[in-house]
A protein has these predicted regions:
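An N-terminal-biased, well-structured beta-alpha scaffold segment characteristic
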Residues: 1-94, 217
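Glycine-rich, N-terminal phosphate-binding loop of Rossmann-like dinucleotide-binding domains
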Residues: 8, 52-53, 75, 199, ...
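C-terminal helix-to-coil terminal segments
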Residues: 2, 87, 94-107, 132, ...
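Short beta->alpha connector loops at strand-helix junctions that form conserved
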Residues: 28-30, 74-75, 91-102, 173, ...
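Hydrophobic Val/Ile/Leu positions in short beta-strands of Rossmann-like dinucleotide-binding domains
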Residues: 6, 146-148
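Rossmann-like adenosine-cofactor binding region
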Residues: 42, 57-60, 174-271
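Short, Asp-centered acidic motifs that coordinate Mg2+ and/or phosphate
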Residues: 47-48, 70, 201, 229, ...
Length: 308
């Protein structure tokens, strides 16, 4: 039987299905925190490895997996996988493209509504007997402008939902041809800075590459519309966290929703600790009960098909 190692959480019916197809599937979501055990498991003739974003598929781990044929990624970001080495060694990498689109898009819209309205943060005061009605008056999203950095599948899903709220949608994506049909869903902007200057919300939807690392830096934050809300569900390294924290404290940013960070979990003493108007979540924008099922079955079937 061909052996499959699953090092992070996966929908268990999909794991059982792999076993029913005749595969020796080892499911241990704690392996991600025991790299030596994971390497040992791969050395035992593993043909497939299924991961999320925490398992670093590179260096010693790839060396241990000498018989690996395929890596299944329970998600879409691939920056935790050494794609060049996988390509050189003939290891196929399968992302769960489309599996978490709805989840991420709904997270972005939710963050926009929560941060724009603001009243949702009044619970502790109200239940303590205070009545901060004037303080809790927020703003509507109708008539505002959303700027999307990157206009792939997830950003397009965000655009469609935002337009249903009466939000104007702009997008900047230098890799999407100007005549692409997708542009019917947003107004194209040639330069990032011109979009930032007029956007009430800015949402990041770009992979982490040498070109996008710290894309949102102090200069870009200064170029944004004062009081704008920044949302990052892409990768932590695409923005300067210290600069974002400072912009929140100074009021330059009206709010931020950050689901991804340069280092996860955040280290002690992070500049984001205590920053006002910050909605911080532990890399869960794409993880819902429904998306976990979709992603797990996409990868289970993809890996099984490859090994068969």
């Amino acid at each position: 039987m061909k052996r499959i190692i699953i090092s992070e959480f996966m929908d268990e019916p999909a794991v059982e299905w792999l076993k029913e197809q005749g595969f020796d599937a080892t499911y241990d979501p704690g392996l991600v925190d025991r790299p030596d055990d994971l390497a040992a498991a791969l050395e035992a003739d593993a043909r497939a490895l299924i991961v999320r974003n925490r398992t670093q598929v590179r260096g010693p781990l790839l060396d241990a997996g000498g018989k690996l044929e395929v890596v299944g990624r329970l998600g879409v970001g691939l920056d935790n996988i050494d794609l060049e080495t996988c390509k050189t060694r003939g290891i196929t990498v399968l992302p769960a493209t489309g599996g978490n689109t709805v989840s991420v898009a709904e997270y972005v819209i939710t963050a926009m509504l929560v941060l724009r309205r603001g009243a949702w943060f009044g619970t502790s005061e109200v239940t303590a007997g205070l009545w901060p009605r004037q303080k809790m008056i927020g703003q509507e999203v109708m008539g505002t402008t959303l700027g999307l950095i990157g206009f792939g599948e997830i950003a397009q899903a965000v655009a469609a939902r935002a337009q249903a709220f009466g939000i104007r949608v702009l997008a900047h994506d230098p890799f999407l041809p100007g005549d692409a049909a997708a542009w019917r869903g947003a107004e194209r902007r040639e330069t990032l800075d011109e979009m930032l200057a007029v956007s009430d919300f800015v949402s990041l939807h770009t992979p982490l590459t040498p070109e996008t690392r710290n894309l949102i830096d102090p200069g870009r934050l200064a170029a944004m519309k004062e009081g704008a809300i920044l949302i990052n569900t892409a990768r932590g390294g695409v923005l300067d966290e210290a600069a974002v924290a400072e912009a929140l404290r100074s009021g330059r940013l009206g709010g931020a929703a950050l689901d991804v960070f340069a280092e996860e979990p955040l280290p002690a003493g992070s500049p984001l600790d205590g920053a006002p108007n910050l909605l911080a979540t532990p890399h869960v924008a794409g993880v819902t009960e429904q998306s976990n099922v979709r992603i797990s079955w996409l990868i289970a079937r993809g890996v099984a098909g490859h090994l068969s």
